[in-house]
Amino acid sequence: MYTSSLRAITIKVLLDNEPFLPGLRLDWGLSILVEGRGGPRLLMDTGSSASRLLGNAEELGVDLANLDGIFISHWHGDHCGGLPGLLDITGSIDVFVPREPGWLMKRELRGKGARLVVLRGPARLVDGFYSTGDLGGEHSLIADVEGLGLAVLTGCSHPGLDLIVRTASSYLRKPVHALIGGFHISSYYEGRKLGTFLAQQGLKVVCPCHCTGSPAKRGLRDVLGDVVLQCGVGMELKLEARGGASKQARGPVG
């Protein structure tokens, strides 16, 4: 299928339960800003607290008042808890969701200007950005980067990363280059098993965070080596085709 790709993207982790840069607030939750060069700006998830999200954004010099959309991976409080407070800043805005929330939450969000866009199947969001569609109550965000392939951002990966990666690749008929987010695994064995699958899929950048345990990260690193990057609050990752390479913020895996 035809897709409009992005020349480059910048990914910034605004909330996570692990640190990367000092002086930022931690949260058992996740929020990641994805910016296309000269193009759309989408925020995936809002963590559990708008005050922590907005505080970190201010500390990092990130303007959340001018987004092109908000992407909620699933309706767990550690991923959507900051949404009502964020809407006080953004005003009327598209909020891409896999399913509608409960009626009380829906009424509150619509009252604050949220235009809930329910994505039951794979779909284009804005130029260069797509959704896997609802995979059992959760969807993942896809960015199509020209010359590299796909960057897939996951909330908690409850549907399983094999399904998420294959759905993204099949929908856009391109390989997945990068995977960032919560992987929902804890043990060393699970990390090695996932690492083997991701190696078979040819991934070049893997950034586990949120609900990915330290033993699982070690298992991933033992299989994938330097493909696995440290992630945490304040981490910034730039993906751009330069002779087939990508520019990354690298660091040791905890």
Q: Which residue ranges define each predicted feature?
A:
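N-terminal amphipathic/basic leader segments beginning at the initiator methionine
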Residues: 2-15, 124-129
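Conserved beta-strand hairpin/beta-sheet module of binuclear metal-dependent hydrolase folds
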Residues: 9-60, 139-154
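General beta-strand structural signal in soluble alpha/beta enzymes
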Residues: 11-13, 44, 97, 117-118, ...
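Active-site metal-binding loops of divalent metal-dependent hydrolases
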Residues: 15-18, 46-48, 75, 100-101, ...
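Catalytic core of the metallo-beta-lactamase
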Residues: 23, 31-35, 117-173
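Active-site metal-binding motif and surrounding structural segment of the metallo-beta-lactamase
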Residues: 51-96, 169-179, 199, 204
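Cap/insert and terminal regions of metallo-dependent hydrolase folds
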Residues: 79-82, 149-150, 156-237
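Metallo-beta-lactamase
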Residues: 97-140, 146-147, 229-243, 247, ...
